[in-house]
């Protein structure tokens, strides 16, 4: 299914970014897990199957925006607190316009910022990921335009080094 393939791809790219950023081995493992599990809350919504072939309503979009919190709740009590936090905040934006908590800049957990850029690159550049696909080069252009607004500039620079 698309959600599984997407999660695997985000996990692999998160690992590559973590390694490029010279994170300690345990932090690389956390990045891999955060990438793999970032959309685990979607299972509670059945979003992948329900809305694939149509535009969701505003109510459905609001439900969708709860998946990071649902994902964090699924991981509570597992000892993966940093991964759970990364999952909760992977839709936060550098400028504070994201969700669920409208965090900005360095207030967004580091792994959330890493997973966010990996996820957007995958959604933009891989066929069958919920929207029309663009080339990897075009995806990088789009992400570069969001540097300092949607994305942490450090993560964008690491992404460019990893995928080019």
Say what each PLM segment does:
Residues 1-164:
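Histidine- and acidic-residue-rich, metal-dependent catalytic cores
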């Amino acid at each position: 299914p698309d959600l599984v393939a997407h999660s695997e791809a985000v996990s692999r790219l998160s690992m590559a970014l973590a390694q490029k950023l010279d994170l300690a081995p345990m932090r690389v493992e956390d990045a891999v897990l955060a990438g793999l599990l970032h959309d685990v809350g979607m299972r509670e919504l059945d979003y992948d199957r329900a809305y694939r072939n149509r535009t969701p309503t505003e109510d459905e979009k609001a439900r969708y925006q709860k998946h990071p919190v649902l994902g964090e709740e699924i991981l509570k009590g597992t000892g993966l607190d940093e991964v759970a936090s990364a999952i909760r905040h992977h839709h936060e934006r550098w400028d504070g316009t994201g969700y669920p908590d409208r965090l900005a800049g360095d207030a967004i957990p580091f792994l959330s910022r890493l997973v966010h850029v990996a996820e957007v690159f995958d959604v933009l550049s891989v066929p069958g990921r919920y929207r029309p696909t663009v080339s990897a080069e075009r995806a990088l252009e789009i992400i570069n335009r969001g540097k300092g607004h949607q994305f942490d500039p450090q993560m964008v620079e690491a992404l460019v080094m990893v995928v080019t």
